[in-house]
């Protein structure tokens, strides 16, 4: 009889304790998630980067030696200064303090202009002075960063960031006939450090800002600088989907002096972003 009573009362009690534990755990997890802004573990953002102004200057070799003539891509070579390109951003959050970020986009610009410059322009041993030169510059960025949230409240997240910007330039030049073709390329991994801020105006509406910069000098072969500023706002239409828009500017300056290429590139892109964001 005692065993029967024990079994009769023990089963409901144990079941109740298990359910209570599960419910308490779920409530605690939900409360912990609700205590900080932007608790989502994974973010994927697909959007358009509307480049409203692109400024590019680079040096090429000349018959006079040295770094040669500095060309303004839009003014001297008729290069495009506006473009609309796809852009991808993502992050993975390990917990409320630590996350990794990823960004990539590519700007492909073309130009055509008759050169009337002195000294004559010689690229890869080919003289383009006095003729029509067709050009193409492709700028590709891959950015991988780490963010540490030193302040994370129900309204605000402040983070310091560190990472690597892999900057790739491909330059191509040719004449009207296609008989003269020159190509050059620069790939520079530039480290960067910065600050991120997120502010939840309401549970659905938020504002985000990021500022990053760095300068590096390696022996006499590479000298580079980087700046990146972004300001955007987004609104959550649903729990896992938001739309937004913002302002973005990125600039870099590279001076290269090695056996493969000697020259410099100064580049700046500014414009607007429009995007849709998935949260999980």
Give a label for each model feature.
Residues 29-107, 271-273, 277-279:
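Short glycine/proline- and aromatic-enriched beta-strand/turn motifs that initiate or cap beta-hairpins
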Residues 54-83, 106-140, 166-187, 216-222, ...:
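Extracellular/periplasm-exposed beta-strand and loop segments of Gram-negative cell-envelope proteins
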Residues 46-48, 88-92, 144-148, 162-164, ...:
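Residues on the lipid-exposed face of transmembrane beta-strands in outer-membrane beta-barrel proteins
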């Amino acid at each position: 009889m005692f065993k029967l009573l024990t079994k009769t009362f023990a089963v409901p009690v144990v079941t109740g304790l298990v359910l209570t534990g599960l419910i308490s755990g779920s409530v605690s997890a939900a409360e912990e998630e609700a205590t900080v802004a932007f608790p989502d573990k994974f973010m994927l953002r697909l959007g358009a980067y509307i480049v409203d102004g692109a400024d590019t200057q680079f040096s090429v070799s000349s018959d006079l030696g040295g770094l040669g003539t500095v060309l303004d891509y839009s003014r001297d070579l008729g290069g495009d200064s506006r473009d609309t390109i796809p852009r991808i951003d993502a992050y993975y959050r390990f917990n409320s303090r630590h996350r990794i970020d990823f960004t990539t986009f590519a700007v492909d610009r073309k130009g055509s202009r008759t050169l009337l410059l002195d000294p004559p322009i010689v690229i890869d041993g080919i003289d383009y002075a006095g003729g029509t030169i067709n050009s193409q510059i492709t700028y590709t960025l891959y950015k991988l960063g780490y963010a540490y949230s030193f302040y994370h409240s129900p309204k605000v997240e402040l983070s310091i960031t560190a990472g690597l910007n892999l900057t790739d330039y491909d330059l191509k030049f040719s004449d009207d006939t296609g008989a003269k073709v020159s190509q050059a390329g620069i790939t520079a991994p530039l480290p960067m450090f910065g600050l991120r801020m997120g502010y939840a105006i309401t549970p659905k509406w938020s504002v985000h800002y990021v500022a990053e910069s760095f300068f590096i000098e390696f022996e006499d072969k590479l000298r580079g600088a980087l700046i990146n500023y972004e300001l955007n706002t987004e609104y959550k239409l649903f729990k896992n989907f938001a739309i937004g828009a913002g302002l973005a500017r990125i600039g870099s300056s590279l001076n290269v002096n090695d056996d493969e290429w000697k020259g410099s590139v100064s580049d700046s892109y500014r414009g607007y972003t429009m995007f849709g964001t998935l949260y999980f």
